[in-house]
């Protein structure tokens, strides 16, 4: 069952949490980067509106919005500007989003954070109800990452999804011919070997996945040159400094991935999210962001599953 044919829980959350007509002119002042529902709920309302509505993961909060947590629920909110993060729990509710100081809006770190927040807030997320067919063992093998676009050469790992006990072959092809070929692969990932020919920045490579003699998936990617990679690393360091030392690890990962994705580095953004999930597997925002990345790279079924997981974790009581 595709994303267009299922109930879109997160879309409903985002729409019902919207402020009245005219609120679109308000600046984004914060974003929910973590949700811990516990036995309670995280709710939001716009300025001048009486009703509280459910707040979902990665919800962009406009200046003037109020956020509250009930019972033992809590949310982490990253603030625009160099203001770090705030944990909103019942004792700190309601929390009203304020505008960042005017003098921060010309700082590079502010603009970088705005780019990340803009990407994270621009994705219309559709979350299906649990569907057993999406987890069928009969699904075809598919390359998960990279899937087009630029990649950083120092973190290049090929990942795919296939049958549990099957063996696969990977081939990297340049315009001049085959650069790398590995067969008999089990598992689901292969780091680019250190003894393989170095990939040339700016060259369009084709990654092919084979099952037996059949090519089952194929994508293109490009390694960025060192100056561009160094610029990106410098920007990520500035974002880290702008967030401050007290931002929780998962929220930091969300913002780093948002900045990477806003610059087109979807492979590296996914790498950051997957790494964060190894230590915080129950965080709805990480699953929602993973769904965003899958949706943007042409993997609707994988996006469905990630959104489904985000929905279940953000609101365990919902059927």
Where would I find each of the regions flagged by the language model?
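Long, contiguous interaction/recruitment modules in multidomain scaffold/adaptor proteins
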Residues: 121, 126-246
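Flexible, surface-exposed loop/linker segments and immediately adjacent secondary-structure boundaries
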Residues: 23-157, 232-233, 266
């Amino acid at each position: 069952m595709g994303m267009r044919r299922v109930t879109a829980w997160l879309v409903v959350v985002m729409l019902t949490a919207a402020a009245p007509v005219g609120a679109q002119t308000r600046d984004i002042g914060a974003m929910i980067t973590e949700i811990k529902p516990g036995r309670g709920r995280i709710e939001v309302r716009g300025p001048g509106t009486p009703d509280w509505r459910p707040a979902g993961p990665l919800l962009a909060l406009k200046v003037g919005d109020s956020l509250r947590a009930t019972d033992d629920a809590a949310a982490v909110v990253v603030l625009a500007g160099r203001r770090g993060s705030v944990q909103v729990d019942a004792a700190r509710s309601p929390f009203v989003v304020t505008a960042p100081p005017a003098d921060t809006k010309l700082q590079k770190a502010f603009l970088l954070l705005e780019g990340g927040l803009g990407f994270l807030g621009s994705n219309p997320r559709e979350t299906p109800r649990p569907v057993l067919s999406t987890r069928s063992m009969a699904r075809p093998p598919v390359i998960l990452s990279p899937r087009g676009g630029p990649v950083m050469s120092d973190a290049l790992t090929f990942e795919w999804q296939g049958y549990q006990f099957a063996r696969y072959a990977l081939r990297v092809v340049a315009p001049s011919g085959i650069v790398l070929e590995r067969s008999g692969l089990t598992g689901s990932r292969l780091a680019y070997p250190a003894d393989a020919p170095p990939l040339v920045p700016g060259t369009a490579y084709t990654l092919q996945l084979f099952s037996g003699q059949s090519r089952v998936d194929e994508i293109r990617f490009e390694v960025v040159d060192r100056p561009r990679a160094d610029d990106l690393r410098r920007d990520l360091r500035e974002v880290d400094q702008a967030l401050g030392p007290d931002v929780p690890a998962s929220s930091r990962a969300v913002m780093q991935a948002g900045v990477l994705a806003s610059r087109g580095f979807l492979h590296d953004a996914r790498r950051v999210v997957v790494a964060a999930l190894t230590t915080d597997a129950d965080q709805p925002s990480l699953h929602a962001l993973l769904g965003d990345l899958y949706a943007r790279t042409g993997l609707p079924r994988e996006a469905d599953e990630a959104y489904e997981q985000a929905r279940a974790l953000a609101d365990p009581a919902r059927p």
